[in-house]
Amino acid sequence: MTKRYWNIDLEEMMRAGVHFGHGTRKWNPRMAPYISAKRKGIHIINLTRTARFLSEACDLVFDAASRGKQFLIVGTKNKAADLVARAAIRARCHYVNKKWLGGMLTNWSTTEKRLHKFRDLRTEQKTEGFNRLPKRDAAVLKRQLSRLETYLGGIKYMTGLPDIVIILDQQEEYTALRECITLGIPTISLIDTNCNPDLADISIPANDDAIASIRFILNKLVFAICEGRSSYIQNS
């Protein structure tokens, strides 16, 4: 895998608050190598390590995108939901930004059935098929469609398991991470000071609570994916 330059600036990361970890009482000792200091009861993340692992992650996603691989971005915190959707759409990635449904990947056959149902209902709605039904039946189907849109809207074009999964909060998305580990799907995960750095294939130490921090990391990864996609198109 070729190493590239991704313009990861330490001062820019500081302005985004990437270096702020959790309180010193709420930490995972395995994160010690990624912590540079304690300040006012808060662990400070070593941004040099962040830059190194973020650069590695960018190299990985660029390489995968340049070979036409598929990505899934998972971030279900309310405050990050819109950010996740916009970033994923920009890079033509699948995404889950509302709720991870248990077994979404490990029980893929069930997820596929839900996606088929979702597509059928969307087609029915577009062709005004609901208007030909009794009001009560139409209302039931509209509720089903709304629910499916909420939980599966970001993966509606997914036809198989993703090649790489990007996880924006290890603790919040632990079920998703475990499913990826079970299936052997490579993962990139943001890890705050209360996380386990040994679970994902590439763990990026960073503040996973502040929107500015999540945006900074996600924008770098999405840029690398977009660059890789451009390379794939040029070489096709």
From Swiss-Prot:
<dbReference type="InterPro" id="IPR018130">
    <property type="entry name" value="Ribosomal_uS2_CS"/>
</dbReference>
<dbReference type="InterPro" id="IPR023591">
    <property type="entry name" value="Ribosomal_uS2_flav_dom_sf"/>
</dbReference>
<keyword id="KW-0689">Ribosomal protein</keyword>
<dbReference type="GO" id="GO:0009507">
    <property type="term" value="C:chloroplast"/>
</dbReference>
<dbReference type="GO" id="GO:0005763">
    <property type="term" value="C:mitochondrial small ribosomal subunit"/>
</dbReference>
<comment type="similarity">
    <text>Belongs to the universal ribosomal protein uS2 family.</text>
</comment>
<dbReference type="GO" id="GO:0006412">
    <property type="term" value="P:translation"/>
</dbReference>
<dbReference type="Pfam" id="PF00318">
    <property type="entry name" value="Ribosomal_S2"/>
</dbReference>
<keyword id="KW-0934">Plastid</keyword>
<protein>
    <recommendedName>
        <fullName>Small ribosomal subunit protein uS2c</fullName>
    </recommendedName>
</protein>
<keyword id="KW-0687">Ribonucleoprotein</keyword>
<dbReference type="GO" id="GO:0003735">
    <property type="term" value="F:structural constituent of ribosome"/>
</dbReference>
<keyword id="KW-0150">Chloroplast</keyword>
<dbReference type="InterPro" id="IPR005706">
    <property type="entry name" value="Ribosomal_uS2_bac/mit/plastid"/>
</dbReference>
<dbReference type="InterPro" id="IPR001865">
    <property type="entry name" value="Ribosomal_uS2"/>
</dbReference>
